[in-house]
Amino acid sequence: RRSIYTTYFHNSRLLVSVGQRVQRGQPIALAGSTGRATNDHLHFEVHAAPTDSLPAIIGDDRYPPFTTNPELWIEPLPGTGIVAGRVWDSQGRPVRQARVYGLVKPEPQETPFSFAETYGERTRGTPAYQEHFAVSDVPAGEYVVGVTIEGQKVFRRIRVEPGKLTWVEFRP
């Protein structure tokens, strides 16, 4: 059993109290640039923890031990889906920080999307998927996605459907 916790950083103002129940779509805070931030934005984290101990979840080294990719926890924008998957080397090990090319995301326009990157040492896949990467808000359509593994380019053809998750795996 896992407890799911979310954290929201850089808020200019909180609109709810700690422990208050909220409804889907209810604003809980206003984005800001508090803390170590250079512009207004929301830093959102999802923690899938085997404990409900807040000190164990947050951690003391600024890298919470149960952080997962929040893109798999948020409903995609209308007309878009989610692409998630795994990238393996020839020995069956995850390839860390590999760039997965070929996907597009129309938002945000001010910071164009160019590639997904597989997780590094400190990021974990979600408990349900154990994915190595995930990208939300990908417009529905056909894509050829690719990654380089051990110097070899590997491609896969995928179809993204609105509101659904598309799974893809890469091996040399």
Residue ranges of model-derived segments:
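Gly/Ser-enriched beta-turn/beta-hairpin loop segments
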Residues: 1-5, 37, 62
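Short histidine-centered loop motifs in beta-beta connectors
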Residues: 2-25
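Hydrophobic core positions of the immunoglobulin-like beta-sandwich fold
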Residues: 8, 135-136, 158, 170
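Acidic, glycine-rich catalytic/binding loops that coordinate metals and/or anionic ligands
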Residues: 17, 45-130, 139
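Short hydrophobic beta/alpha edge segments that flank linear recognition/processing sites
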Residues: 23-35
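A short, solvent-exposed beta-strand micro-motif common in secreted/extracellular proteins
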Residues: 139-151
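Structured interaction patches on ligand/partner-binding surfaces of diverse proteins
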Residues: 149-172
